[in-house]
C-alpha cells in the first residue's frame, strides 16, 4: 500500500509540474482558442522544441502507469446512471460519479444507496448529500 501512496504523491507532483499545453499562436487571435493542436509548420519553433517556445505534448509528461486515470483520492472513477449500476461497485477500490443526464429524484435514490453501501460519490458535495439524506 505504501508503494501506491508513493505513486499517488508522485502523480500529484508531476501534475503540478506539467505545463499548460496550449495551441501555437493562441494569443494572436481569440477565434482559434487555446485547445491543443500539434504544430506542423515548416519553420515552427514550437515543433522544433526551442527552449523559449511553449512546451509540446510528449510521453514524458505522463504519470505512473499504476495510478494513471485514478481520482486524486486513489479510487477508480465509475460513471453511474442508476442504483443497479451503483450496487455493482466495490467501495474499496471504486467511487461513483453520477451521470449528468440523471434527474433529481433518481440522484437522491443513488446518494441514499451509496451512503448505505459506503460508496463515495465524487460529484455531489457534502452539503448536498446531507440535504438528500434528510429528504
Curated annotation (Swiss-Prot):
Gene that specifies this protein: rpl32e
InterPro entries: Ribosomal_eL32 (IPR001515), Ribosomal_eL32_arc (IPR023654), Ribosomal_eL32_CS (IPR018263), Ribosomal_eL32_sf (IPR036351)
Example GO BP: translation
Keywords, comma-separated and alphabetical: Ribonucleoprotein, Ribosomal protein
SUPFAM superfamilies the record matches: Ribosomal protein L32e
Protein name (database record): Large ribosomal subunit protein eL32
SMART domains noted in UniProt: Ribosomal_L32e
Species of the source: Methanococcus maripaludis (strain DSM 14266 / JCM 13030 / NBRC 101832 / S2 / LL)
A GO molecular function held by the record: structural constituent of ribosome
Amino acid at each position: 500500500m505504501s508503494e501506491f501512496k508513493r505513486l499517488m504523491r508522485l502523480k500529484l507532483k508531476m501534475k503540478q509540474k506539467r505545463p499548460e499545453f496550449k495551441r501555437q499562436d493562441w494569443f494572436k487571435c481569440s477565434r482559434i482558442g487555446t485547445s491543443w493542436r500539434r504544430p506542423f509548420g515548416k519553420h515552427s519553433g514550437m515543433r522544433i522544441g526551442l527552449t523559449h517556445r511553449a512546451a509540446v505534448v510528449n510521453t514524458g509528461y505522463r504519470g505512473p502507469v499504476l495510478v494513471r486515470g485514478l481520482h486524486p483520492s486513489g479510487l477508480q472513477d465509475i460513471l453511474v446512471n442508476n442504483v443497479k449500476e451503483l450496487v455493482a461497485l466495490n467501495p474499496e477500490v471504486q467511487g461513483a460519479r453520477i451521470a449528468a443526464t440523471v434527474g433529481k429524484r433518481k440522484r437522491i435514490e443513488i446518494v441514499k444507496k451509496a451512503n448505505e453501501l459506503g460508496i463515495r460519490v465524487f460529484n455531489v458535495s457534502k452539503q448536498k448529500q446531507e440535504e438528500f439524506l434528510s429528504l
